[in-house]
């Protein structure tokens, strides 16, 4: 895609130089984000979701201190995680896009949720702070469709009376890799904008109408940090870590809740996990006045009959420890820990579904 079609000439050259500088960093994000430099034969290995990386990193460090066991995790995106577990090169894949039950059966996999969190739009617009800008899902989709191209467009201005909006081109940033974060983002946009649903749809990778791609949540955050007048979407912890202003989104009840553990929990409150085969459940655009509209889950995906039963048992020991003892760490990073009833359901699922 031609970058000149996305940005004013004044930003084109800068973005071209930025792309060169960030390319190697973004391509190496998975290696930088690994929880150990190299994996020994005894290490638990996993790959996938960048959404879950902040809490998985904390859990891994604490687990290593308590048990001496290590987790080597590559934060490469949900698509990469699914590809690696299918290739049996890791003990588990992590994805924010659940596999359908029929695909799990075909591949011999099982999956279970780990944590709940939120995906937030983030911006780099001079003078606008976190929570000051409000957008509906429809307008967000129109921005990503290329229908709304300036920050002072009437569609944005009408939602933000009194807020000074620049007469500048919107620089759209999206994911370049197979991404569960993108799956939930595009799933949400498909629910709130018919044009998006018919022209683009949902998926871990879609044909983006406009914008430039960053690899991982890390790459999107890096672009938004450096590109003036940009907008992107990241897991909430990345917004906090990079000090990126977030945008408020109108939810299904017509309210504009702040993104935090409370609003993510409100969205998750109505999730009926007991009715979800293999925990296949998507929480975007959930009902409730306090619900954050782009709330998501990360699933761990593992073989039901692994070739190496000892490594599989080690992975389950880590997940059991994390789900039963990692709530405090998850909450500190503004994720929502799974309720005890769901943890019990997950552990029963392990017993019933996995061998070895």
Task: Give the location of each predicted region.
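Sec/Tat signal peptide C-region and signal peptidase I cleavage site
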Residues: 15, 35-41
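Assembly/oligomerization scaffold segments
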Residues: 21, 35, 94-95
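Short hydrophobic transmembrane-like helices used for membrane targeting/insertion
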Residues: 1-2, 17
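Bacterial N-terminal signal peptides
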Residues: 26-34
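Flexible loop/hinge segments at secondary-structure junctions
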Residues: 41-356
């Amino acid at each position: 895609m031609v970058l000149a079609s996305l940005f004013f000439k004044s930003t084109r050259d800068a973005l071209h130089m930025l792309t060169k500088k960030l390319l190697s960093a973004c391509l190496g994000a998975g290696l930088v984000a690994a929880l150990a430099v190299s994996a020994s034969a005894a290490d638990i290995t996993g790959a996938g979701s960048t959404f879950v990386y902040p809490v998985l990193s904390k859990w891994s460090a604490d687990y290593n201190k308590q048990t001496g066991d290590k987790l080597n995790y590559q934060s490469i995106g949900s698509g990469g995680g699914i590809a690696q577990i299918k290739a049996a090169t890791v003990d588990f894949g992590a994805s924010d896009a659940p596999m359908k039950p029929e695909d799990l059966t075909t591949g011999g996999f099982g999956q279970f949720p780990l944590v709940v969190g939120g995906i937030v739009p983030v911006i780099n617009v001079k003078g606008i702070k976190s929570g000051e800008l409000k957008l509906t899902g429809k307008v967000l989709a129109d921005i990503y469709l290329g229908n709304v191209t300036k920050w002072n467009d009437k569609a944005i201005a009408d939602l933000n009376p009194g807020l000074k909006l620049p007469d500048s081109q919107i620089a759209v940033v999206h994911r370049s890799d197979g991404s569960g974060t993108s799956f939930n983002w595009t799933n949400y946009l498909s629910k709130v904008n018919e044009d998006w649903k018919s022209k683009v749809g949902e998926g871990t990778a879609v044909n983006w109408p406009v914008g430039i791609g960053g690899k991982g949540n890390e790459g999107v955050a890096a672009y938004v940090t450096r590109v003036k007048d940009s907008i992107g979407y990241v897991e909430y912890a990345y917004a906090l870590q990079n000090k990126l202003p977030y945008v408020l989104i109108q939810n299904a009840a017509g309210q504009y809740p702040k993104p935090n553990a409370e609003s993510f929990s409100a969205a998750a409150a109505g999730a009926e996990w007991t009715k979800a085969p293999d925990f296949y459940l998507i929480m975007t655009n959930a009902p409730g006045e306090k619900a954050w509209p782009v709330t998501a889950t990360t699933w761990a995906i593992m073989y039901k009959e692994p070739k190496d039963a000892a490594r599989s048992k080690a992975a389950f020991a880590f997940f059991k420890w994390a789900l039963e003892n990692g709530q405090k760490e998850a909450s500190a990073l503004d994720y929502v820990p799974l309720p005890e009833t769901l943890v019990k359901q997950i552990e029963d699922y392990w017993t019933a579904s996995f061998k070895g």
